[in-house]
Amino acid sequence: MLIGILQTGLAPEALQDANGDYPDMFQRLLDGHGFTFRTWKVVEGEFPASVHDADGWLITGSRHGVYEDHPWIPPLEEFIRQAFAEHVPMVGVCFGHQIIAQAMGGKVERYADGWAVGATDYDFDGEKITLNAWHRDQVTQVPPGAKVIATNDFCANAALLYDDRALTVQAHPEFRPEFVDGLMKTRGKGLVPEAVMAAASQRLAEPLQDRTMAGRIAAFFKEPRA
């Protein structure tokens, strides 16, 4: 099964030698599930010719906001709507979670209570899953037809399921602790409050359920579809 990665942001260059870029992180996360991958850098205006150029699509995270004025965001939203119409499955992570929601009629805003960074606990339909986070934007209005499948006190709409069309999560299952640590030392400086980063640093060694989330993503992609 070919998964097309729609890359909407670039990892900091200083961290790429040790961690790779975002597509590398997702390939590492989903290793062992039988997928092959191809990446399109939509952040640089590179788009697939058709929603059928892959068997499923994965939209990455980004430092950009989905509500910002970038020339590649409207065509990405149109691509998402076309994939929905053609029943091509999509997974969205962080920015990907938000852009799918926005494209399908939801609302995304900068959250008044600020940032979620590092190991964060989520309630996935009664199951506690801890994943790394890095965001201050949130889906504040769920699109029609989407079901909330994960939540916590900070992020009410932490994961959404759109029947068999899309699975989206606000957290970053692809982020390893050392990458979060690197982000705090690079992009976090002067942007994320020191108290938030200090609390995140205290949880860097905590076990994550990234493999659990990888299994959920893989199972979603592999669901039988008419």
Can you annotate each of these PLM segments?
Residues 1-71, 75-78, 82-86, 194-226:
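N-terminal beta1-alpha1 cap of cysteine-dependent amidohydrolase-like domains
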Residues 2-7, 25-29, 85, 123-226:
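Amide-donor transfer/coupling interface in amidating biosynthetic enzymes
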Residues 15-16, 49, 68-69, 101-103, ...:
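Short glycine-/acidic-enriched loop or helix-start segments at secondary-structure transitions
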Residues 18-21, 52-54, 71-74, 105-108, ...:
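Short, glycine/charged-enriched secondary-structure capping and boundary segments
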Residues 36-38, 107, 130, 147:
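Conserved beta-strand segments of alpha/beta enzyme cores
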Residues 44-48, 116-119, 140, 156-157:
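A short acidic, often aromatic-flanked loop/helix-cap motif at beta-alpha or helix-coil junctions
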Residues 59-124, 130:
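Cysteine-nucleophile active-site neighborhood
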